[in-house]
Amino acid sequence: MILVIAEKPSVAQTIAAVLGAKEKKDGFLTGSGYIVSWCVGHLVGLSEAAAYGEQYKKWSYDSLPILPQEWKYTVASDKEKQFKTLKELMHRADVSEVVNACDAGREGELIFRFVYEVAGCRKPMRRLWISSMEEAAIKEGFSRLKNGEEYDALFASALCRAKADWLIGINTTRLFSVLYNHTLNVGRVQTPTLKMLVDRDAAITTFKKEKYYHVRLALSGAEAASERISDKAKADAFKTTCEASRAVCTSLVKEKKTAATPKLFDLTSLQREANRLFGYTAKQTLDLAQALYEKRLLTYPRTDSAFLTDDMGDTAAGIIKLLCGKFPFMAGKDFTPELGKVLNSKKVSDHHAIIPTMELAKTDLAALPESERNILTLAGARLLMATAAPHTFEAVTAVFECAGQSFTAKGKTILCEGWKEIDRKYRAALKSKPETDDADSDTEKTLPPFTEGQTFENPAAKVTEHDTTPPNPHNEASLLSAMERAGSEDTDPDAERKGLGTPATRAAVIEKLVKGGFVERKSKQLLPTKDGINLVCVLPDTLTSPQLTAEWENNLTQIAKGKADPAAFMEGIEDMARELVKTYPFLSDDKAQMFKPEREALGSCPRCGSPVYEGKKNYYCSNKECIFTMWKNDRFFEERKVAFSPKIAAALLQSGKVNVKKLYSPKTGKTYDGTIVLADTGGKYVNYRVELPKKK
């Protein structure tokens, strides 16, 4: 029997159906010589720090740095049953080999290898490496299974990534949390990402708006604009001068230009466009693309390539023909794809670009959930655009001289709409129309037929007022672009992988920052919180700079190719952890209070006037020399079965009394309405009394 282990139950079921393993068992399927089971994501992971000794259970500076000599692994508590199933299957006498069918990438390799190692399996291992869940792709993948050893370098890279994240994450999080008395989650990728958000926020906050002006001449129905003028009075005076002068066309330049077709989607560009068009978060887009992949409708989503392999021409042509028949916005269009633009095996590493599959022929698009349909249609539309003709146009720039200054008018004439016709029709078919970026809109009109030397006497003129604009806050689309480019200017130009994180991890990084309270979403915007801004301010450049992380990613890529030493990489990580702990032994008291939560005072102390705050068990005066305290479990309130709430405490502090309904009488066993009065006499304990409403 051959044991096949997939990453998820849904993928296992698809593979089992192709292999003929139809008999369902508890935690696996079997039949036709195969057993197909699954991991349910990360079944096994690196153990928490506490597993390495009692001294690490409590967070303290003295226990840092934590540098495991022998790494320990832990089975996820909620997945122990499935791990036990896999371990038993691996050790079954009739199982001769194990096939790793987890996702074809760094994390998929790690998920499988952790289970394989912790289960103590030593049976031969082979690797299934596919980019599509279509039946034909699965069959082809099983016909060319590779020896597991060929992916040892990929596993080494994945293991280094996991250990490096553990070492930097655990040590820096504990270090700065202890120093600042507040849980501060620090991460190799998330902290430089947060820094980019904080930098953008600072640029917006410090931006000073300035007005500027243009003088515009009306020339045969076209407008020619002057250079910027900073002074309104000068602009008005110049306008008057122009209206009494002659404008002469001194230059007329016509250029044929081409807007190249967009590339196919890799994961990051798909996430950016889905955010721009539909407002989906990076995580939502990844989840939707993964769901479509598991339904065999989309190719593997966690890719960083925007090309197909050279041998995929016929496949792409078949899918394009299918899309032309499926998409209403392609109805009646005679479309001949230019496939050569999207085929380039040299630019495909693990997986090719994201495109729909032929499974679409059997699928009713209308039956899909709207969000999945949006992603599938978006990927299909991009395949059509990428193989369409270029968009060509003639750009005309006319320069005029008037009153000693230059004026410019620009226009364009479309020669071939090309791929932009598909883009326009696709957008028009969308249920909700996205906002159009300035870069995408063709605002330039066709200019009149000007000629050099042409003159205009006393042209009409006007002054237009404008404001300089601050940078826009980051949204998911712009942040993903920034993460992708981060560190590029400081990184070796020959580096194969640059930027923060990988296409597969960037969505999770953004979500972690939001959940940690360092970033908040406002509509489509991603804004740093006060804690986020403070965290970036207190951390050293080594943790906030994207350069280091970008270098790490490139090193991990080289390890995956067998071109770099994993041991040397880990030694550098450990040295960094040691250096950080040595550099930050203590803080001044004012800095240590930086992350102390801002408390809202309930009122003023009736004895000294200082703010009164809520504690776990009481309401206390903030003046350490004052002993005024109202206890939540005061017998006065407990006897009357009244919860001493912050609302009651605030009313007592403000007016000395509060009306309360349904006070319990221990004497009569009944309830009544009354007024609780703060009867403070200045002693150790605060006294209260009840006043009953006066009878009319």
Regions found by a protein language model. Give the residues of each.
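Conserved short loop/turn motifs at secondary-structure junctions
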Residues: M1, A101-A104, N181-T183, K254-K263, ...
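Intrinsically disordered, low-complexity regulatory segments
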Residues: M1-A162, W166, R427, P470
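Basic, low-complexity terminal or inter-domain segments flanking catalytic cores
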Residues: I2-L3, K25, K79, M90, ...
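Amphipathic alpha-helical transducer elements in NTP-driven molecular machines
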Residues: P9-A16, G33-V36, V40, A76-K87, ...
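Short, polar/flexible loop-turn hinges at active-site or ligand-entry regions and domain interfaces
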Residues: W71-T74, C102, R122-R126, N147-L154, ...
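C-terminal or mid-to-C-terminal helical accessory/interaction module adjacent to the motor/catalytic core
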Residues: E135-L217, K254-T258
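Metal- or metallocofactor-binding catalytic centers and their adjacent structured scaffolds
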Residues: K232-F265, Q271
